[in-house]
């Protein structure tokens, strides 16, 4: 007869789970043994659950999150009791804040020891009650395992969030109750979930159409909730002669080669997106929870319509005239027949001019030579030229995200993600590995900085060594912008707080990630001079295995937002006057960038 652990793993298999990310420990010995037995039992069919051993449980949760983001399936992570469970939390909050389905399974002290301050005993119900608020259960009886698993999986998929199961150590070895009795006080649950079609009431669709039809300068903003609706968005935009900006999590929703797509919005966004938001008279938000009001239109001058599958997000960021509760694709397909075909192309012509102006400014700023390394804009422009059509790109928190947001252009078929809501450091490398495991035929590219690599990315290169031999196309590329600085923090302090660079806080040791990659048997290239950049990138994309391209970039190249404010300029000046150790260089480089942008606009 099967144990509880064996039944639980087979139940996950019945739900379609084929990969679990985790790290072993004696609090989950029963589950680890069950995974191995399951693997042996399914050896001939070839559809066994694959256990991916990571270097740290946080990265297991990151990988489960990435798996859910890129495949649409449930991500599953596994950790032992106490410290292992604690380590999962940051990655689980990444999943929760970006609204993707992840199930966490964690061990616990034996039932007979709970409450006795036993070794590695932690109050996991309290620890997980926020991150897994949708469904959190400590399993205490074999008869409750079936419905516990079923509800945890269905809850994660249905609510697109995190759920968690806690399994005491002794329960894992008990005999399973695969079919609970048909009696009172037992639950007989089943496997299966099909996501529903959420559509607004016809009356509300007509109200939304009336607002959009009345507008002459319609701007669309899409987020991750619009993934999979590209054709419907294009049709609606063409009907309205609208332009479209993208929140960062929605960067891959639409290809950037469409002339009316302005790119990303916000501090990391483009000039064209900012200008469109300032000049539109109507705003249509689709599947986005973009939080930065200063980059949205003035709400007293613009009419708004929003589409979102989560009713709690409707009207949260902008006082819309019409809020449509519905899934993006289904709602847009019903809305399209109600929209009138606009023929005036002047608004799109204005958007195209802003796009061209932004391109000229970026090109002019990219021609500025770095004083302490390579201009990071050069790195990302050259990287963009080499992106394969079906690649998967992951990004980290930091200045590497700023540059990739502006300079990496999406095409149809590409995938992209990062930690959006949580904006945590460290997910780019585990995200890329999870993406490669899910799509071995695609090139996976992680864009990160030296800070995030030193935090946890470098450890997961060891994990990669364990699995890289599996893939038909073994290319997975790590682009590391090494500026020897926690540069995002440095610039935020300069521009927001008027505080100078604080070396003890922000400066990083210059540790070569490329050299570490070579220790693992991968290709590792360290680019110190601009003339080495193009050959290194060409070699990376031609390689037949994992590659780390470490580029020494200039930390003093400023990241001017598209609408830099007088307050930011004043704060920046204060930081320089307070004795920023890089003040003279930063000021000189910033003046060059401002002048380059001014001359580009004047041409």
Feature-to-residue mapping (PLM):
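Active-site nucleophile and cofactor-binding loops and adjacent substrate-binding regions
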Residues: 23-26, 51-62, 77-83, 140-141, ...
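Thiamine diphosphate
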Residues: 105, 113-122, 315-317, 323-325, ...
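Short acidic/His/Gly/Ser-rich catalytic and metal-binding motifs that mark active-site loops
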Residues: 174-177, 253-256, 314, 360, ...
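Active-site diphosphate/adenylate-binding microenvironment
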Residues: 5-8, 13, 26, 31-35, ...
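Active-site phosphate/pyrophosphate-handling residues
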Residues: 7, 59, 378, 459-462
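N-terminal alpha/beta PP-like core and its mobile active-site loop of ThDP/TPP-dependent enzymes
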Residues: 1-342, 386-389, 443, 468-478, ...
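Phosphate/pyrophosphate-binding active-site segments
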Residues: 143, 167, 190-191, 210, ...
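Short, well-structured alpha-helical segments that form the helix of a local strand-helix-strand
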Residues: 149, 354, 534-537
């Amino acid at each position: 007869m099967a144990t509880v652990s064996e039944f639980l793993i087979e139940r996950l298999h019945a739900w379609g789970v084929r990969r679990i990310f985790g790290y072993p420990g004696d609090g989950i010995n029963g589950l680890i043994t069950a995974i191995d037995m399951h693997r042996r039992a399914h050896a001939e069919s070839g559809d066994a659950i694959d256990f991916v051993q990571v270097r740290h449980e946080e990265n297991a949760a990151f990988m489960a999150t990435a798996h859910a983001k890129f495949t649409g399936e449930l991500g599953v992570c596994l950790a032992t009791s106490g410290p292992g469970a604690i380590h999962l939390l940051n990655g689980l909050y990444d999943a929760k804040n970006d609204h993707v389905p992840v199930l966490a399974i964690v061990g616990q002290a034996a039932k007979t020891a709970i409450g006795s301050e036993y070794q590695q005993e932690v109050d996991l119900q309290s620890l997980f009650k926020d991150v897994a608020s949708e469904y959190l259960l400590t399993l205490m009886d074999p008869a409750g395992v079936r419905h516990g698993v079923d509800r945890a999986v269905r809850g994660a998929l249905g609510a697109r969030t995190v759920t968690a199961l806690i399994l005491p150590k002794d329960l894992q070895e008990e005999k399973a109750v695969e079919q609970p009795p048909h009696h009172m006080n037992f639950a007989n649950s089943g496997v299966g979930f099909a996501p529903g079609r959420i559509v607004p009431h016809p009356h509300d669709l007509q109200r939304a159409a009336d607002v959009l039809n009345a507008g002459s300068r319609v701007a669309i903003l899409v987020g991750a909730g619009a993934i999979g609706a590209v054709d419907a968005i294009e049709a609606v935009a063409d009907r309205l002669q609208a332009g479209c900006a993208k929140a960062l999590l929605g960067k891959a929703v639409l290809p950037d080669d469409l002339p009316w797509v302005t790119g990303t919005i916000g501090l990391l966004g483009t000039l064209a997106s900012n200008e469109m938001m300032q000049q539109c008279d109507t705003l249509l938000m689709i599947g986005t929870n973009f939080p930065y009001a200063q980059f949205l239109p003035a709400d007293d001058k613009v009419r708004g319509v929003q589409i979102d599958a989560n009713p709690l997000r409707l009207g949260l960021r902008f006082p819309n005239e019409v809020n449509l509760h519905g899934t993006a694709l289904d709602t847009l397909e019903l809305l399209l027949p109600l929209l009138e075909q606009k023929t005036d192309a002047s608004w799109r012509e204005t958007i195209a001019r802003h796009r061209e102006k932004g391109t000229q400014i970026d090109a002019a700023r990219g021609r500025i030579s770095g004083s302490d390394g390579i201009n990071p804009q050069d790195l990302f422009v050259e990287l963009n030229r080499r992106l394969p059509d079906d690649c998967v790109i992951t990004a980290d928190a930091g200045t590497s995200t700023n540059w990739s947001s502006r300079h990496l252009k999406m095409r149809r078929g590409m995938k992209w993600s990062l930690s959006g809501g949580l904006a945590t450091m460290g997910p780019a490398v585990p995200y890329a590995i999870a993406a490669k495991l899910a799509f071995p035929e695609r090139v996976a590219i992680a864009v990160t900085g030296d800070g995030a690599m030193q935090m946890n990315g470098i450890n997961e290169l060891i994990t990669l060594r364990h699995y890289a031999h599996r893939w038909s196309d073994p290319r997975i590329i790590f682009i590391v912008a090494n500026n020897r600085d926690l540069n995002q923090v440095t610039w935020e302090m300069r521009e927001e707080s008027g505080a100078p660079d604080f070396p003890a806080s922000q400066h990083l040791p210059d540790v070569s990630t490329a050299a570490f990659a070579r220790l693992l048997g991968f290709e590792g290239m360290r680019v110190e001079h601009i003339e080495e950049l193009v050959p290194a990138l060409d070699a990376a994309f031609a390689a037949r295995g994992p590659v780390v391209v470490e580029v020494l970039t200039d930390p003093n190249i400023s990241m001017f937002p598209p609408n830099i404010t007088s307050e930011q300029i004043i704060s920046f000046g204060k930081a320089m006057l307070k004795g920023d150790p890089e003040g003279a260089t930063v000021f000189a480089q910033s003046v060059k960038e401002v002048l380059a942008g001014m001359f580009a606009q004047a041409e």
